[in-house]
């Protein structure tokens, strides 16, 4: 039986045990991660935490709605047993009516019929299986990716794991942040706390690229759990655009992890240029479903359209 459980009544030890042992577990769904990223969250729980579904929510005036927090690409149902369309449908049907509106992402394991009325779109992430030897993985690189790596080596760019998360965040703020990326000051604080919490838990790896004159060029935050490494965040300077530092960073990480039972998840992007950059490393597209549920029949469609535009714009800019 699936029941609705308010945050204060969630057994967090059982919750995280479920995520630990889920066939589709992801670090996004751990209680500590949700506590740091979501304004508030409740949950749907099946039986004794056999399967769970987080419900991050906000309240605006009279309306309580489910939303997708920043720094979380996928949520949905996480289960200790094999998932199918019926399970996903049952969880969606169990979302209480007090949530008058919902717009959130499932994960790549959550299946639904193509004609399901709640499907509001499809998101894409890019994944690369690192189980193969480095030489084999390198063969999947595009010509442009190879050129960028060669350029970085010629310019004597070097990679290290020594550095501070603040350097990566600052590079993003000073470059992408100045181009209208809709990050509030709170978002940057949350990101910093997420990284340090992940480091404390042994889930975060940082990689930095420096120029031949020892100037910071680029950095990446990798989150690892459940045999998957997610490229959660990156930042780069204008110099990195000219010296191929970001390509070298990713190539270095692929070489480091090649032959291991790991999948590198680039976290996808709605930006065509960035998606092309990720595909340049031989990654493949993986689709996850976006769910939109409107239980407010008199909610004006223009308002919904405006909300969707803002959400998509934020997603594109965040992943850029």
Please state what every model-predicted region is.
Residues 39-41, 97-101, 204, 259-262:
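Short, high-confidence coil segments that cap the C-terminus of an alpha-helix
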Residues 57-61, 117-136, 259-320:
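Active-site/acyl-donor-binding loops of N-acyltransferases
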Residues 68-109:
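A gly/proline- and charged-residue-enriched helix-loop-helix capping module
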Residues 19, 95-96, 152, 257:
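A generic structural signal for well-ordered alpha-helical segments
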Residues 49, 86-93, 193-196, 200-302:
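Aromatic (often tryptophan-rich) hydrophobic motifs at membrane interfaces
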Residues 2-48, 53-62, 107-241:
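A conserved beta-strand-loop-helix scaffold within acyl/acetyltransferase catalytic domains
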Residues 66-74, 169-174:
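Short, basic/glycine-rich phosphate-binding loops at helix/coil junctions
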């Amino acid at each position: 039986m699936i029941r609705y459980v308010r945050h204060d009544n969630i057994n967090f030890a059982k919750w995280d045990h479920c995520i630990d042992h889920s066939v589709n577990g992801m670090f996004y769904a751990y209680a500590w991660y949700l506590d740091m990223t979501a304004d508030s969250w409740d949950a749907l729980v099946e039986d004794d935490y056999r399967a769970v579904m987080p419900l991050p929510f906000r309240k605006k005036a009279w309306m309580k709605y489910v939303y997708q927090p920043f720094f979380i690409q996928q949520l949905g149902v996480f289960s200790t047993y094999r998932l199918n369309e019926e399970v996903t449908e049952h969880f969606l049907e169990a979302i209480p009516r007090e949530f008058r509106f919902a717009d959130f992402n499932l994960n790549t394991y959550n299946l639904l019929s193509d004609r399901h009325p709640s499907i509001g779109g499809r998101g894409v992430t890019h994944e690369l299986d690192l189980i193969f030897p480095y030489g084999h993985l390198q063969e999947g690189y595009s010509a442009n990716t190879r050129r960028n790596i060669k350029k970085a080596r010629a310019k004597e760019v070097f990679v290290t794991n020594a550095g501070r998360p603040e350097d990566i965040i600052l590079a993003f703020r000073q470059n992408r942040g100045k181009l209208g990326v809709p990050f509030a000051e709170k978002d940057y604080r949350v990101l910093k706390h997420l990284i340090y919490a992940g480091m404390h838990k042994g889930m975060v790896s940082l990689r930095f690229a420096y120029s031949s004159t020892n100037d910071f060029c680029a950095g990446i935050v990798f989150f690892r759990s459940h045999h998957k490494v997610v490229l959660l965040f990156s930042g780069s300077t204008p110099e990195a655009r000219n010296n191929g530092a970001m390509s070298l960073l990713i190539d270095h990480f692929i070489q480091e992890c090649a032959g291991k039972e790991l999948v590198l998840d680039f976290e996808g992007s709605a930006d065509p240029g960035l998606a092309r950059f990720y595909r340049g490393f031989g990654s493949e597209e993986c689709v996850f479903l976006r769910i939109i549920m409107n239980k407010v029949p008199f909610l004006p469609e223009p308002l919904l359209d405006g909300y969707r535009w803002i959400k998509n714009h934020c997603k594109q800019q965040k992943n850029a």
